[in-house]
Structure formats: C-alpha cells, structure tokens
C-alpha cells in the first residue's frame, strides 16, 4: 500500500491509498461486511454506491466459516467476490464486547465461543495469522479497546498492554512474510497524556497507517473532538489516519475537519434495515405514516438506484410489510448517501472550500457548526 497526499485545507487532507487491487480516494468511508457480506448487497451493488474498500470482521469470520474454508477458496476476496481492497479489524473489539464471558491476560484473551460455548483463545499472533489467511489488504493490530468510562489508572494499564500487543502483532506480521499493510491503533481513552504515550510508542514500532481507537464508545462528542484535535497532528503526515467505528454523517464531517482519512461504521446499513434513512436535510423515518402517500423520491438530490426509481410511499409500503427488498433499497440509498458525502468533502478540500461545505451541511440540517479548536 502507498499513501499519496495531494492537498490540505486546514487540517483536512485529500489523498489516496494505492493498492495492487485498486485505488481508494481519501477521505474514504468503508462499508462494513461483517460476515463477508455487506448485509443484503452483492459486491457489484456495493461498488455501484461508490465504495472502493470494505471492512471484514476477523473475529466472526474466524468462528464462521473458519480459516480452512477461507483457504479452500483462496482468501476473503475470492470467497465473497469483492475485487477491491479489504481492511479487516483484529477481532479485539468483538472479544472485549463479550463482557463476562471473556478473561483478559497478558498473553491474550480467553473467552467462550458465542456460537457454541466452547473455550477459545485469541492473541496478537493468532489475529495476525487469521488476517494473513483472509488476504487482508490492511491488517489491524490486536489491541484492547478500552471501555468508557475508564479511570486514568485502568486506561494507562490497558494502553500499555495494547502497546506490547502492538509489538507482538508487528513481529508476527513480519515473520509471516505478509507484504500488505499493517496499521497500529492509538489508545488511551479520553486522557491526552496517555494518547501521547500511545502515539509515540506506535510510531517507534513503525506502521503503515495509524488508527484512533477507543472513541465513539459512549464518551461525549466534545471529548471525541478534543482527542482527535490533540492526536492527529502527532501522527506522521505521510501515513493514513483511520477513525474506527465512526459514525454518523456529522461525525465523518468533524473527523475530516480534524485530519482523519478513513472511517467505517455499521450505521448506514443497520439504520437502513430499521427504516432510518439519511437525506440531505437530515433523517427520514420511512415507516412513519406521513410517507404512506408520498410520491416523491427519498432524496431529490440523490442519484442512487433507489431514489431514481422508487417513491417514499413504495419504500414505506415495503417497510410496513417487512419485505426484504425494502431493506435492500434502503441500504443502497444509505451507502450512496455516505459515499456522496465523502465525495463532497474531497471536492471541498481540493477547492479550499471545506468550511463553506461544512457550514452548508449543517445549515441544511438546521444545526449549528461545532467549534473547531485547532491552530
């Protein structure tokens, strides 16, 4: 992987990730394909929304179908027939979200298989091996996603263990001869001094990109913005910056304003299945009765397949009848909305008009522009 940085506007960056499998224009949003599928979508449909890279889930693909089935096909690209780049998370977040059925040690994490209850163990080395078999174009280190709230002492211990696991991840990644990209993950909760230590330690180890982890886990938005404003300038400028698990459209806008290049989140697909659809002026809850006889498209400014062909009344009908097509059409629209938003942000950075774009974005939704505390 090669990262090219074209231009900046304030702290916002316009560039691209170059892989053997294709180019990803940044800032970029990655749809989430947890089980080797972006829910309800064919790879061709995902590509048609403008997505150039997707995310796969190491933890879930390890449990089902497993490494051996994956290797029978070649790798995850062959298994799911997605031709572009794939980023896989390390499995850390899923393991730590298991709560009482897992035990964290210095060696790794012992837990019960949520499918059948069998005891199972995952550590940095195993995570690197699974992601190698998946053929991931971007591999994520195995870390502990520090929960929120966490006091300073716990956050420090967690961050320090994640640094040790980062080194173990790097060593195993290299020993496998993996020629793809490996990203470090910055931890430290909402504490700036701990984030400083994490960034410094990861840069000393050396990675192809750096993710900001442990945010969007329940902390106030002001804390997320503050940490991004503090951390992003410390990440080497020639490396991509990835904000994990984020987020709402406004979170993408605020991340870009603070220097983030990459995002992922289940929100556009999950919300689509629940009838919450993102439009230029905010959010449409398509199951509400007021849409029953509305013959207008979901979003007159959207060029997606759904908006070009179907009315709000039809989408309302499908949702009320719990038809699978409704979830699919909603997903196509939400994914396209996110890709149109990212394209708009990229164009605004190119033209040096990002803050004008941001102001218009919030005006259309009837909300104030959040403060930006950067030099």
From Swiss-Prot:
Enzyme's top EC category: transferase
Molecular function (Gene Ontology), one example: tRNA-guanosine(34) queuine transglycosylase activity
Cofactors: Zn(2+)
Binding site residues for substrate: 89-93, 143, 187, 214
Residues involved in Zn(2+) binding: 302, 304, 307, 333
InterPro entries: ArchSynthase1/Queuine_TRR (IPR050076), TGT (IPR004803), TGT-like_sf (IPR036511), tRNA_ribo_trans-like (IPR002616)
One GO term describing the cellular component: cytosol
Pathway: tRNA modification; tRNA-queuosine biosynthesis
Cofactor note: Binds 1 zinc ion per subunit.
Annotated SUPFAM superfamilies: tRNA-guanine transglycosylase
Active site: 89 (proton acceptor), 264 (nucleophile)
Domain of life (superkingdom): Bacteria
Stretches the record annotates as RNA binding: 245-251, 269-273
Pfam family, one: TGT
Catalytic activity: 7-aminomethyl-7-carbaguanine + guanosine(34) in tRNA = 7-aminomethyl-7-carbaguanosine(34) in tRNA + guanine
UniProt keyword annotations, A-Z: Glycosyltransferase, Metal-binding, Queuosine biosynthesis, Transferase, tRNA processing, Zinc
Keyword Metal-binding found: yes
Residues passing through the membrane, by range: none
EC number in record: 2.4.2.29
BP term (GO), one: tRNA wobble guanine modification
Entry's family note: Belongs to the queuine tRNA-ribosyltransferase family.
Assembly and interaction partners: Homodimer. Within each dimer, one monomer is responsible for RNA recognition and catalysis, while the other monomer binds to the replacement base PreQ1.
Function recorded in the entry: Catalyzes the base-exchange of a guanine (G) residue with the queuine precursor 7-aminomethyl-7-deazaguanine (PreQ1) at position 34 (anticodon wobble position) in tRNAs with GU(N) anticodons (tRNA-Asp, -Asn, -His and -Tyr). Catalysis occurs through a double-displacement mechanism. The nucleophile active site attacks the C1' of nucleotide 34 to detach the guanine base from the RNA, forming a covalent enzyme-RNA intermediate. The proton acceptor active site deprotonates the incoming PreQ1, allowing a nucleophilic attack on the C1' of the ribose to form the product.
HAMAP family per UniProt: Q_tRNA_Tgt
Name assigned to this protein: Queuine tRNA-ribosyltransferase
Organism: Salmonella paratyphi C (strain RKS4594)
């Amino acid at each position: 992987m090669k990262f090219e940085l074209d231009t900046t506007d304030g702290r916002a960056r316009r560039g691209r990730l170059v892989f053997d499998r294709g180019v990803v224009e940044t800032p970029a949003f990655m749809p989430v394909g947890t089980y080797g599928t972006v829910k309800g979508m064919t790879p061709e449909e995902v590509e048609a929304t403008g997505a150039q890279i997707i995310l796969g889930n190491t933890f879930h693909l390890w449990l089902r179908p497993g490494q051996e089935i994956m290797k029978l096909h070649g790798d995850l690209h062959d298994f799911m027939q997605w031709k572009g780049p794939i980023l896989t998370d390390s499995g850390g977040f899923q393991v730590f979200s298991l709560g009482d059925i897992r035990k964290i040690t210095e060696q790794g994490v012992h837990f019960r298989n949520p499918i059948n209850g069998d005891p199972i163990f995952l550590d940095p080395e195993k995570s690197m091996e699974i992601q190698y078999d998946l053929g991931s174009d971007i591999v994520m280190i195995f870390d502990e996603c520090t929960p929120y709230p966490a006091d300073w002492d716990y956050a420090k211990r967690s961050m320090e263990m994640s640094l040790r696991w980062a080194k173990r991840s790097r060593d195993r990644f290299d020993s496998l001869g993996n020629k793809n990209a490996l990203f470090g993950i910055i931890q430290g909760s909402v504490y700036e001094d701990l984030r400083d230590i994490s960034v410094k330690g990861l840069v000393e180890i050396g990675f192809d990109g750096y993710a900001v982890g442990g945010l969007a886990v329940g902390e106030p938005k002001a804390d997320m913005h503050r940490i991004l404003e503090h951390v992003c300038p410390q990440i080497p400028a020639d490396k991509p910056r990835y904000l994990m698990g984020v987020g709402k459209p406004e979170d993408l806008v605020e991340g870009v304003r603070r220097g983030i290049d990459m995002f992922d989140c289940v929100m556009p697909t999950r919300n689509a299945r629940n009838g919450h659809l993102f439009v230029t002026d905010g959010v449409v809850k398509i199951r509400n009765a007021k849409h029953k006889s509305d013959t207008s498209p979901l979003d007159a400014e959207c060029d997606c397949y759904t908006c070009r062909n179907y009315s709000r009344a039809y989408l309302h009908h499908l949702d009320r009848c719990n038809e699978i097509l409704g979830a699919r059409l909603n997903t196509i629209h939400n994914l396209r909305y996110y890709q149109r938003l990212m394209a708009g942000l990229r164009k605004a950075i190119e033209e040096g008009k990002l803050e004008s774009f941001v102001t218009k974005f919030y005006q259309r939704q009837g909300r104030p522009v959040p403060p930006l505390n950067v030099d």
